[in-house]
Swiss-Prot record:
Pathway: Cofactor biosynthesis; thiamine diphosphate biosynthesis. One of its GO terms (biological process) is tRNA 4-thiouridine biosynthesis. Keywords: ATP-binding, Cytoplasm, Nucleotide-binding, RNA-binding, Thiamine biosynthesis, Transferase, tRNA-binding. One of its GO terms (molecular function) is tRNA binding. Pfam families: ThiI, ThiI_fer, THUMP. The gene is thiI. This is Probable tRNA sulfurtransferase. ATP binds at M185, L186, H210, F211, R267, G289, Q298. NCBIfam families: tRNA uracil 4-sulfurtransferase ThiI. GO terms for cellular component: cytosol. PROSITE patterns: THUMP. The lineage of its organism: Bacteria, Bacillati, Bacillota, Bacilli, Lactobacillales.
Length: 406
C-alpha cells in the first residue's frame, strides 16, 4: 500500500481536562513536538485548541510518526491527505484511497468534521455523500458503525479538506515540563531510568544527577549513565546531565563509619547533594528508582533514615513495582540492555557485605559528627560538571561545561 501523506493530525490526551490552563499545556506540547522534530526544518507545526497539525512538506512520514509515538501528551494521531475543498475532487480522492486500503469483506464507516461552516454540505450530508460514493464503486462494501475495519475521516477546514483512515496510539500522559522540574538520581542500574521515564510521562522535566567516584568508578560507567540519559531524551527532549564528584565523600564515609552503615550514610550524603543541586537549579522534587524491599537501602526503615536530611518531596515512581514489572518497562524504553552492562557505580563499589536493613537515625547522626558534612557537600556541589544531552548521539555533538554556569 502506497499512500503519500501531506499532514499528521495530532489529538491531545489529558489536556482536555485542564480548563483555564489549557493554552499553557497546548503550547508546551507544541514546543516539545518541535524539539523532537527540530532536525526536520521542512515541517510546519501548528497547534490549536483541540489538535495540532504537522505539515510534512515532503518529510519522511515514517520517521516523524516514530518520534511522535514517544511524545507525552499525545492521545493519538492520524496521517492525512490534503485535497481541494470541492465535492467532486473529495469523492475522487475517497475512491482512490479506498482502492489502496480496502479489501473485500471489510466493514467501514465515514466520520466527518466540518470546521468550515460555509462549506456546501453539513457533516451529516457529507457522511451520506461519501458513503454513497463508496457504495457506487465498491458494491460489496458493508457499513458498520461500531468498531468497523476502516474508519475514513474527512475534515473540512478553511484551507482544504483532509482525509485519513489511521489512528496511531500516542504515548499519553502529560507534556513534559508542565509539572515543573525534578532532579533524577540516575545510577547505572535498571530502576532509575524507568523512574525517570515515568516522571517524564507525568509532565516532569528532569535533570539527571549522577555520582561518580573515580578511580573507583570508570569512565565507562560514566558514559553508560550518560547513554541512559540519552535514551530518555526521545521522550522529553534534551536533558541536562549533572556529574557529581563523590570520591572524597565516599572515602571519608568508609574511613569513619561502621561497615553496616556505609550504604545508609552514603545515601544520606547523596540526598543532601542532590537537594542542594535541585535548589540551585530551580527543581521542585527529587526522583529516584527505589523499589520497596528490593535491597537493604530500600526498606521503609532505611528510606526513613535517608529521607531525614531533606524536606524536599522525593518521588519514587517504581516503589511498589516488582522487578519483573520494572524490567518490562526498561525493555520497552530501550534502557535494559544498557543498564545490565557490567560497569560498577559508586553504590556498588563500596557496598558492604551486610548492610543495615533498619538503621537507627540516631546512629547515623552520631557517625556523621565525625565528618565535615557541610564542607564535603559544598565541595561536591561546586565541583559538578554539566553536559547537555541532545539525542542518542550526544557524545558526538556536545561538549561539557563547568558548573560556573549554574
Amino acid at each position: 500500500m502506497t499512500v503519500l501523506y501531506d499532514e499528521i493530525m495530532v489529538r491531545y490526551g489529558e489536556l482536555s481536562t485542564k480548563g483555564k490552563n489549557r493554552g499553557y499545556f497546548i503550547n508546551r506540547l507544541a514546543k516539545n513536538i518541535r524539539e523532537v522534530l527540530a532536525d526536520m526544518p521542512e515541517l510546519k507545526i501548528t497547534a490549536v485548541r483541540d489538535r495540532a497539525h504537522i505539515e510534512l512538506n515532503g518529510a519522511d512520514y515514517a520517521e516523524v510518526s516514530n518520534r511522535l509515538t514517544k511524545v507525552f501528551g499525545i492521545q493519538n494521531f492520524s496521517p492525512s491527505i490534503k485535497v481541494e475543498k470541492s465535492m467532486p475532487i473529495i469523492k475522487e480522492e475517497v475512491v482512490a484511497l479506498f482502492k489502496e486500503i480496502y479489501s473485500e469483506g471489510q466493514t467501514f464507516k465515514i466520520a466527518t468534521r466540518r470546521a468550515d461552516h460555509n462549506f456546501e454540505l453539513d457533516s451529516t450530508e457529507l457522511n451520506i455523500a461519501l458513503g454513497d460514493v463508496v457504495f457506487d464503486n465498491f458494491s460489496y462494501a458493508k457499513v458498520q458503525m461500531k468498531k468497523p475495519d476502516i474508519t475514513l475521516r474527512a475534515e473540512i477546514r478553511q484551507d482544504a479538506a483532509y482525509l485519513s483512515f489511521e489512528d496511531i496510539k500516542g504515548a499519553g500522559g502529560m507534556p513534559v515540563g508542565t509539572a515543573g522540574r525534578g532532579h533524577l538520581m540516575l545510577s547505572g542500574g535498571i530502576d532509575s531510568p524507568v523512574a525517570g521515564y515515568l516522571a517524564l510521562k507525568r509532565g516532569v522535566e528532569i535533570e539527571a544527577v549522577h555520582f561518580a567516584s573515580p578511580p573507583y568508578t570508570s569512565p565507562g560507567a560514566l558514559k553508560k549513565a550518560k547513554d541512559l540519559a540519552a535514551k530518555l531524551t526521545v521522550f522529553g527532549g534534551s536533558i541536562t546531565f549533572i556529574e557529581v564528584p563523590f570520591t572524597e565523600i565516599q572515602e571519608e564515609i568508609k574511613a569513619k563509619a561502621p561497615q553496616a552503615y556505609l550504604m545508609t550514610i552514603t545515601r544520606r550524603f547523596m540526598m543532601r547533594v542532590v537537594d542542594r543541586v535541585r535548589e540551585e537549579r530551580g527543581g521542585k522534587v527529587i526522583i529516584n528508582g527505589e523499589s520497596l524491599g528490593q535491597v537493604a537501602s530500600q526498606t521503609l526503615g532505611s528510606m526513613s533514615a535517608i529521607n531525614e536530611v531533606t524536606n524536599t518531596p522525593v518521588i519514587r515512581p517504581v516503589v511498589t513495582m516488582d522487578k519483573n514489572e520494572i524490567i518490562e518497562i526498561a525493555e520497552k524504553i530501550d534502557t535494559f540492555n544498557l543498564s545490565i552492562l557490567p560497569f560498577e557505580d559508586c553504590c556498588t563499589v563500596f557496598a558492604p557485605p551486610s548492610p543495615k536493613t533498619n538503621p537507627k537515625l540516631e546512629n547515623c547522626i552520631q557517625y556523621e559528627k565525625r565528618m565535615d558534612v557541610e564542607g564535603m557537600v559544598d565541595r561536591a556541589v561546586k565541583g559538578i560538571m554539566l553536559t547537555t544531552i541532545i539525542g542518542e548521539n550526544w557524545d558526538q555533538t556536545e561538549e561539557e561545561e563547568f558548573a560556573d554556569f549554574l
